[in-house]
Design a protein with these regions (language model features):
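Mid-domain alpha/beta scaffold segments of enzyme catalytic cores
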Residues: 1-173
Length: 173
């Protein structure tokens, strides 16, 4: 049986047939599955799906670099509450995305560090989304060397040298 480590079953394109899709996944031997949030609405849906399909679906919650405008004290409090639920297994996806540059880079860095620290405090692994920003991401992670949560850099497209550095910091690719 496969374990899908990164799905977006909360995506609106599945609104018409989400439950049928999940049933087909089970029939085809896919699962369990981690459905990954990226903003507060998606996080809410990911948690609801994981609760509805307990033992088969799990959730990851976090604020994606495109949506860092949503991150404030209230959303951080809600994210912390969610990661304490048994169905939530990771904090993410979080990181830096300079490819689309949909949010100011300084705001992305601040949100990344804030969530990284919270994940460490909550002993949650992280799912890192780093796109065209490996230099800045590695600089920020190096500053916290020895004080980082475990995690994975998903959908990796950087250099071999950057991959080796993420690995040396304790992350999986």
């Amino acid at each position: 049986m496969y374990f899908d480590t990164h799905a977006h079953l909360d995506d609106e394109r599945y609104d018409q047939d989400r439950e049928e899709l999940i049933a087909r996944m089970k029939q085809e031997g896919i699962g369990p599955c981690l459905t990954v949030g990226a903003n507060m609405d998606m996080n809410r849906m990911a948690v609801a799906l994981a609760q509805r399909h307990e033992g088969y679906l799990y959730a990851a919650v976090g604020i994606h670099p495109h949506d860092v405008g949503e991150l404030n004290d209230a959303t951080m409090e809600q994210l912390r509450a969610w990661v304490r639920l048994p169905c939530v297994k990771a904090w993410g996806e979080i990181g830096l995305d300079y490819f689309y540059d949909r949010a100011p880079r300084d705001a992305q860095k601040e949100a990344f560090m804030r969530q990284l620290e919270a994940a460490r405090e909550e002993n949650m692994p992280v799912i890192l989304h780093i796109r065209d920003a490996h230099g800045d991401a590695l600089d920020l992670l190096r500053q916290r060397r020895g004080n980082l949560p475990r995690g994975v850099v998903h959908c990796y497209s950087g250099s071999w040298e950057s991959a080796q550095e993420y690995l040396s910091l304790g992350f999986d690719i």
